[in-house]
Amino acid sequence: MGSKTFEGEGQRGGNDPSNSTSPNSAGGEPRGAHLSRDGDGSLGDGDGDDGADGDEKDGAVTTTPLTEQQPSSETTSKKKKRRKPKKKISALKQSSPPRVPLDDLFPTGQFPVGETHEYGSVVEGTARTTSEEVRYLSRNYLQDDSVLTDYRKAAEIHRQVRHWTQENVRPGQTLTEIAVGIEDGVRALLDNAGLETGQCLQSGMGFPTGLALNDCVAHYTPNPGQKDIVLQASDVMKVDFGVHINGWIVDSAFTMSFDPTYDNLLAAVKDATNTGIKNAGIDVRISDVSAAIQEAMESYEVEIGGKVFPVKPVRDISGHNINRYQIHGGKSIPFVKNSSQTKMEEGEIFAIETFGSTGRGSTVEGFGVYGYGKDPNAPKKVSSPLASARSLYKTINENFGSIVFCRRYLERLGVERYLAGMNSLVNNGIVEQYAPLMDMKGSYSAQFEHTILLRESCKEVVSRGNDY
């Protein structure tokens, strides 16, 4: 999920992975899919010989010693009873649409490790200071095996759900169908419907599913009261969704197109994201990562309708670090060169993402609302003359906390007549409202994103798959 930056402020308006793109974006078997087919090797009867008994071996010949008494003809004429081979228990595999809980596919609780990169040598003059070491002590959760397990499980769910999305989403479907399909898949694999009080805080969507088309760069999701949009064969669609377990959010995004015209646009943004991942690390200045991203993206151009467009990095959205239950943690990674001296630090979690556009490369807020997010520093209770505001705030605290949510999620919980209360919370700065972000009409934009963990010994691209 892109973080809006301060440089600028509805929908359709007018280890070195390959950068090649296919007509429907980055398809392919997700990392760990073989494990989900095999049930991580722990299911089955354990015979390993398709029903052979005891020490019988396929192709083995048994002989009778000459000194042993030979059986009578009557004995030999009797038909020897053959034992029925044991039925082999078939390994579980993921269904389509994905509905098998991930814990059933990985009964040992061990999930695929993300792609790991060793750190390069530390640049002289950028070694950690004492204050940074103190900050690290307050966020050493990546040393906790349970946190790593939560992250890897959430990442595997993301891979399996996006694999289904890439294989099944086609023009002619509505954006509501697509969003609900993704979200139903995530909840099914988590084995948590999220309908009881507090369940959404245990696990669920990390933020509303983003389905931004063409000149809508980011922050669009179908919501009640809006006209539903039908996906067209000429559309370029950014698919951005998050999965959280115990507040640890995996944020990953990809772009789908159905026309090879846009292949170079997708390739540019994928290359820029992978360049950002390659350059990220402990003690690295964010400005250096930004400069590398810009250089990679601007080396591409795309021809549309006989006209050549440079691929421009979008200047007023950025990558970001992630805190527990907080998708935007405070640090930003712009896609253009800057003079910031802020560094990445050990123990931090980053969403490395890039957006590229054939338009201006900057955005304005569009019509409508994408979602809402409670201020992490907001009080536990609010005093408001509106009973609807007080009731809504209680619902937000019990079900979302500081996780970004949308109107669809409220109505799924059965919340009614909440708009006046929501407006009150927004106007008082307790809840932030997010609008769609638009580039110029007629332009096209793409996005790719991964979540990386800056562990002590390596950076782990936890959301990496065989697709992107």
Swiss-Prot record:
Record GO terms (molecular function): initiator methionyl aminopeptidase activity; metal ion binding; metalloaminopeptidase activity
Binding site for a divalent metal cation 2: 251, 320, 353, 449
Cofactor note text: Binds 2 divalent metal cations per subunit. Has a high-affinity and a low affinity metal-binding site. The true nature of the physiological cofactor is under debate. The enzyme is active with cobalt, zinc, manganese or divalent iron ions. Most likely, methionine aminopeptidases function as mononuclear Fe(2+)-metalloproteases under physiological conditions, and the catalytically relevant metal-binding site has been assigned to the histidine-containing high-affinity site.
Biased segments, Basic and acidic residues type: 1-10, 31-40
Positions of a divalent metal cation 1 binding: 240, 251, 449
Region annotation (Disordered) ranges: 1-106
InterPro entries reported for this sequence: Creatinase/aminopeptidase-like, Met_Aminopeptidase_Type2, Pept_M24, Pept_M24_MAP, Pept_M24A_MAP2, Pept_M24A_MAP2_BS, WH-like_DNA-bd_sf, WH_DNA-bd_sf
CC cofactor: Co(2+); Zn(2+); Mn(2+); Fe(2+)
Record's compositionally biased regions (Acidic residues): 46-56
Binding site for substrate: 219, 328
Biased composition (Basic residues): 78-90
Feature: compositional bias, Polar residues: 16-25, 61-75
CDD domains, per the entry: MetAP2
Catalytic activity: Release of N-terminal amino acids, preferentially methionine, from peptides and arylamides
Alphabetical list of HAMAP family matching this protein: MetAP_2_euk
Designated name of the protein: Methionine aminopeptidase 2
Origin species: Aspergillus oryzae (strain ATCC 42149 / RIB 40)
